[in-house]
Amino acid sequence: MSSILNVIEKLKLNVLNVEDVPESFSSDVYKLTLANGEKVYVKIPFNKDKLYREFQMIETLKDVIPVPKVLDFWDGDEITTGALLLSAIQGIPCTEDIDEKLSFQIGVFHAMLHEVKTPGYGYHVTDGFKILDQNNWRLHIKGNFEKWKEPCKEILDPELYERCILHFDGVFSALPEPDGSCIVHMDFRPGNILVNDNKVTGIIDFESARGGSSEIDFTKINRYIWGVNPRTKLPYIDGYRTIRPMVNLETVLPFYDFYDAFSAVVWCKNRGVEKNQSFLQENISTLQKSVGNEQTRY
């Protein structure tokens, strides 16, 4: 709470009420009611790179898809990483039932996001856009997996871990040529898609967005929308294809479902296994399904 009070002071906000937004898993997000009755959001990112990344992505996308307006920006001090003051968008996260009509719209907006080109494969940091080593997406994906091996080894059952290592080599080599580089959200899920009256009104949370291949961006949609209601898959794809071609989902989805779960195990280790136990178990279960192993230890 001291961080938000620090931000309120630095941005000289006249605030009536402060509410924590619990759905934010990485950064701290607060909903403020100002003295004039206006609702705004303050986002305090986990680190300074995420602060600049979110700011740059919102600025890039503001005339492309519905995103929050950046009302103010503070680059932080020795106590707080910094903060974004964001406008409120009318709507709520679409975590309830998603029908075919809404799924079509989500597909359209997701494709519009992917149509925005980036200077290369890479991401925004505090001092600009950092291009990946050799501007090579496949090298980046393989490098990430190598980096995650050691922390995953400490969490996963040894047999499951070994199966994961073998599984990666097989599915990685089968991937098609990446498309890109374009903006990928990296956390495109119902909680970050705002709707009102069954219409998409906003896309939020760009702190992990970067220049990548669109193939990485369908994992959460597959898990939390198509997996819950399979009837939403075709309308989504139809909506997406009104803007741009769809990648070969049959090839890329199994790989990225596995890759995303392996990454999430590392995230849980870094952020605390105990407090992220259910999320850890969800991802261990995904790994088990991917490689066909039902044993775990943690």
Language model segments and positions:
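An alpha-helical support segment within catalytic cores of ATP-dependent transferases
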Residues: 2-13, 115-186, 241, 276, ...
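Conserved N-terminal boundary motif of the eukaryotic protein kinase catalytic domain
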Residues: 12-20
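ATP-binding pocket architecture of kinase catalytic cores
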Residues: 19-135
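Short beta-strand segments
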Residues: 41-45, 71-72, 183-186, 204, ...
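Glycine-rich, phosphate-binding/catalytic loops in enzymes
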Residues: 58, 102, 202, 219-221, ...
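Active-site activation/catalytic loop segments of kinase-like enzymes and analogous catalytic loops
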Residues: 215-246, 258-274
